[in-house]
């Protein structure tokens, strides 16, 4: 093999909106409410190995806005990417998939969610930046804690999945 073939390689093959749903269970009455909505945001990351060097990474986001006890809207979206990653040492592969890939995908997710909320007739909600490294490290610590509590249990990747 030549040196070029052994060089670390990272390529974004595709970025795509995998899934999105929007519910407005209390429309149109909710538009008459004067109170400011409370907003809850949840974000998750999953990864699957599709081939030897090809990974699908999915960043999921759920935004729920409520006025008093009534749901104004609920939006769920999954932004995905297919990444070709080769010649990366195993100890660097999981952080690359769990930190770098979600960092690339999140701006697309944030934009799609803001656009859908606006098109639904609500003021835009701009999701704050996420420190995926801190999220990754937090999950890694949780996995290590669980592994210590249940010695001998198989470990998954900190991004919530086991890479096969």
From Swiss-Prot:
Keywords tagged on the record: Chaperone, Cytoplasm, Protein transport, Translocation, Transport
GO BP field: protein folding; protein tetramerization; protein transport
Stored SUPFAM superfamilies: SecB-like (SSF54611)
InterPro entries: SecB (IPR003708), SecB-like_sf (IPR035958)
Family matches, as Pfam families: SecB (PF02556)
Compartments, as annotated in UniProt: Cytoplasm
GO molecular function terms attached to this record: unfolded protein binding
Keyword Transport: yes
Cellular component per GO, a single term: cytoplasm
Family assignment from sequence similarity: Belongs to the SecB family.
HAMAP family on file: SecB
UniProt xrefs under NCBIfam families: PRK05751.1-3, PRK05751.1-5, secB
Complex formation: Homotetramer, a dimer of dimers. One homotetramer interacts with 1 SecA dimer.
Role summary: One of the proteins required for the normal export of preproteins out of the cell cytoplasm. It is a molecular chaperone that binds to a subset of precursor proteins, maintaining them in a translocation-competent state. It also specifically binds to its receptor SecA.
Protein's UniProt name: Protein-export protein SecB
């Amino acid at each position: 093999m030549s040196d070029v073939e052994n060089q670390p390689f990272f390529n974004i093959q595709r970025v795509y909106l995998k899934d999105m749903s929007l519910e407005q269970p209390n429309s149109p009455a909710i538009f008459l409410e004067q109170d400011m909505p409370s907003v809850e945001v949840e974000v998750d990351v999953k990864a699957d190995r599709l081939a030897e060097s090809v990974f699908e990474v999915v960043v999921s986001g759920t935004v729920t806005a409520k006025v008093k006890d009534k749901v104004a809207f609920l939006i769920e979206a999954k932004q995905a990417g297919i990444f070709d990653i080769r010649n990366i040492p195993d100890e660097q592969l999981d952080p690359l998939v769990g930190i770098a890939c979600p960092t690339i995908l999140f701006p697309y997710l944030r934009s799609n969610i803001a656009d859908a909320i606006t098109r639904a007739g609500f003021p835009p909600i701009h999701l704050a930046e996420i420190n995926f490294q801190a999220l990754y490290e937090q999950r890694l610590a949780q996995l290590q804690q669980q592994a210590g509590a249940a010695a001998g249990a198989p470990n998954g990747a900190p991004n919530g999945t086991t890479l096969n």
